């Protein structure tokens, strides 16, 4: 299995270094649900601003404040402890009376607004996230500037970030031990983390192998293509390659890579043979995913940061703004810009 640090770069390995997250204020995330609260219903959507505390900790504190069970407070996604993050929590509080959440106090956390909502906020139910990052002590401004320009045109690999695999790769190691021993895993969280790490690692490896090709975005017979921003896909045929290539070049269509699991992967012929060869040696992880009935899926191979802009404060400090769809990793963007340094170089989102 290819180590995350050794995955293929789209724009070549960065020439310089830089400090990511010298302090939490250098990594700002604003969650974009893609919808507004209904204004009525048995749930309450609470928009919070937090710094120095993780999402689960805040959710548990909110449940305690509302005198409800912790499982009655949900969220669309975990946000990093070591960052300034804005996100929504959802508490199930039936009844006409609206609690006064302005009285909710927690160090490092502030309630920005709250309103009634009809439905529970479920994991993954967000449109995306807006990021504002500050990179400090940049050693090669010219290289970073050119890479930012190139990313606007060509995007970045849509890798799952290193944090998906746990500190020191612990989630992936857990998946490998599980695959090798076949011992039942009772802890639901461990099961989820380990299976997710296994599938993500296989996806990253397929993308890394594809990026070694001279023309990364060249459509081949049997590729699974998806409309930009959509989840469904269709299979490319030889007769359509020229037209499909035009649409890929125009960013109307995205080439996808497999999230291996049980069932068909989605590609056919040449593309399927390539994907199978890319992970042929990872039989244990593939067997684990099939055994645990994790369905195969697809994910775009490349990621195009939206609304990308940047501002150099000086020759060694740059502030970068961009928006990413749900499930994408800001660290996969930063990875193409600089070789990161600092305690939190691999901890984000």
Curated annotation (Swiss-Prot):
Q: What is its EC number?
A: 5.4.99.27
Q: Which residues form the TRUD domain?
A: 155-303
Per the record, what are the reactions this protein catalyses?
A: uridine(13) in tRNA = pseudouridine(13) in tRNA
User: What GO terms are given for molecular function?
Assistant: RNA binding; tRNA pseudouridine(13) synthase activity
Database matches in InterPro entries: PsdUridine_synth_cat_dom_sf, PsdUridine_synth_TruD, PsdUridine_synth_TruD_CS, PsdUridine_synth_TruD_insert, TruD_catalytic, TruD_insert_sf, TruD_pseudoU_synthase
Biological process (GO), any one = tRNA pseudouridine synthesis
A Pfam family of the record is: TruD
Positions annotated to bind substrate: 27, 129, 329
Family of this protein: Belongs to the pseudouridine synthase TruD family.
**Protein name per the record:** tRNA pseudouridine synthase D
From which organism does this entry originate? Escherichia coli O1:K1 / APEC
**Encoding gene, per UniProt annotation:** truD
């Amino acid at each position: 299995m290819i180590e995350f640090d050794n995955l293929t770069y789209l724009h070549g390995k960065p020439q310089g270094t830089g400090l990511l997250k010298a302090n939490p204020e250098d990594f700002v995330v604003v969650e974009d649900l893609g919808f507004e609260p209904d204004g009525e219903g048995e749930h309450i959507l609470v928009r919070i601003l937090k710094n120095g505390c993780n999402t689960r900790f805040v959710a548990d504190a909110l449940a305690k404040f509302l005198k409800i069970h912790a499982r009655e407070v949900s969220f669309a996604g975990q946000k990093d402890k070591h960052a300034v993050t804005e996100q929504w929590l959802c508490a199930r509080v039936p009844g006409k009376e609206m609690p006064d959440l302005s009285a909710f106090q927690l160090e490092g956390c502030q309630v920005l607004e709250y309103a009634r909502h009809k439905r529970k906020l479920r994991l993954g139910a967000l449109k995306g996230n807006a990021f504002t990052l500050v990179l400090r002590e940049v050693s090669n401004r010219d290289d970073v500037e050119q890479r930012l320009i190139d990313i606007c045109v060509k995007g970045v690999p849509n890798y799952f970030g290193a944090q998906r695999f746990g500190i020191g790769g612990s989630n992936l190691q857990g998946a490998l031990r599980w695959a090798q021993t076949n011992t039942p895993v009772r802890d639901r969280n461990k099961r989820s983390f380990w299976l997710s790490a296994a599938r993500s690692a296989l996806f990253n490896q397929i993308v890394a192998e594809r990026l070694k090709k001279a023309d990364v975005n060249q459509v081949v017979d049997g590729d699974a293509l998806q409309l930009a921003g959509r989840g469904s896909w269709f299979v490319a045929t030889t007769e359509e390659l020229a037209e499909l290539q035009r649409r890929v070049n125009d960013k109307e269509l995205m080439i996808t890579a497999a999230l291996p699991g049980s069932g068909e992967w989605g590609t056919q012929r040449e593309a399927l043979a390539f994907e199978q060869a890319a992970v042929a040696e990872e039989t244990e992880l593939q067997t684990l995913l099939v055994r645990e009935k994790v369905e195969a899926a697809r994910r775009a191979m490349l990621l195009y940061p939206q609304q990308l802009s940047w501002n150099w404060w000086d020759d060694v400090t740059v502030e970068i703004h961009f928006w990413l769809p749900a499930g994408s990793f800001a660290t996969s963007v930063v990875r193409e810009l600089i070789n990161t340094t600092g305690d939190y170089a691999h901890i984000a989102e």
